[in-house]
Amino acid sequence: LLNRLPNGLFRVCLDLIINYVSGKIRHSFIRILPGDRVKIEVSPYDSTKGRIIYRLHNKDLKDSFFNFTIPFVGIQFEMKNFKKLIFFQEIDSELR
């Protein structure tokens, strides 16, 4: 827990989660590239693994709910419930 925000919200630091693409996305030939915002389901048995279930439309970084900065990787996410997260990963220009 990093800090408390208004309206009962909290800023929480999470570990990076290893994800795989769900069968529907793979079957539909939807391309997921670095920088895309996606919705994931986190496994109830292992919180370090998840599944990408939906690719969201990209928005401006200012519209994000939370913004954590980790060296070389920026992570933004919005908590929907305990099993689903909206997850966005952006590779910093230093890595390109």
Curated annotation (Swiss-Prot):
One cellular component term from this protein's GO annotations in UniProt: chloroplast
InterPro entries: NA-bd_OB-fold, RNA-binding_domain_S1_IF1, TIF_IF1
Coiled coil: none
Domain S1-like stretches: 18-57
UniProt keyword list: Chloroplast, Initiation factor, Plastid, Protein biosynthesis, RNA-binding, rRNA-binding
MF GO annotations: rRNA binding; translation initiation factor activity
Location of this chain's protein in the cell: Plastid, Chloroplast
Short name of one Pfam family: eIF-1a
NCBIfam families, A to Z: infA
Subunit structure: Component of the 30S ribosomal translation pre-initiation complex which assembles on the 30S ribosome in the order IF-2 and IF-3, IF-1 and N-formylmethionyl-tRNA(fMet); mRNA recruitment can occur at any time during PIC assembly.
Family: Belongs to the IF-1 family.
Cited function: One of the essential components for the initiation of protein synthesis. Stabilizes the binding of IF-2 and IF-3 on the 30S subunit to which N-formylmethionyl-tRNA(fMet) subsequently binds. Helps modulate mRNA selection, yielding the 30S pre-initiation complex (PIC). Upon addition of the 50S ribosomal subunit IF-1, IF-2 and IF-3 are released leaving the mature 70S translation initiation complex.
Name listed for the protein in its UniProt record: Putative translation initiation factor IF-1, chloroplastic
Gene name for this UniProt entry: infA
